[in-house]
Amino acid sequence: MISEIQQRYQAVRARITQAALQASRNPDDVQLLAVSKTFAAEQVREVAALGQRDFGENYVQEGVDKIAVLKDVPGLVWHCIGPLQSNKTRPVAEHFDWVHSVDRLKIAQRLSEQRPAHLPPLNICLQVNIDGGSTKAGVSPTDALALARAVSVLPRLVLRGLMTIPDPV
């Protein structure tokens, strides 16, 4: 019998396939980032067994704990997608593959300094507050280019793009 989590995952994959085909795209070119916060490590393992490899965590310690439990699963890619405070940069630098919420040079510098030399550079996205909402984190659009330039020279980071959260329509 198929579990609820398997059904949900397969339904999302089916929607991605349908949307990709409608847009004349190859569904295999669409990457799903499964947000695994609040799900147990064994549920993540179940979805990984279906082929999912990229998982996003909002909470650093919860993510670090899951990464440790699931280290026997090959090919998992871990994304830190939540806000990042400077006192949490070390475990992120040591355990995650991606950070989607870099909004200050200080955070980027700490991540670069704390990234172990035996690991590949940490992939990062700059979080940009595109609508100026005071409740949202992120660098302002006017300061984003300067931050990108400063981050792009840090030796243990690779700037991959931007992360934005628009106001709901």
PLM regions and their residue ranges:
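Conserved alpha/beta-domain cores
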Residues: 1-169
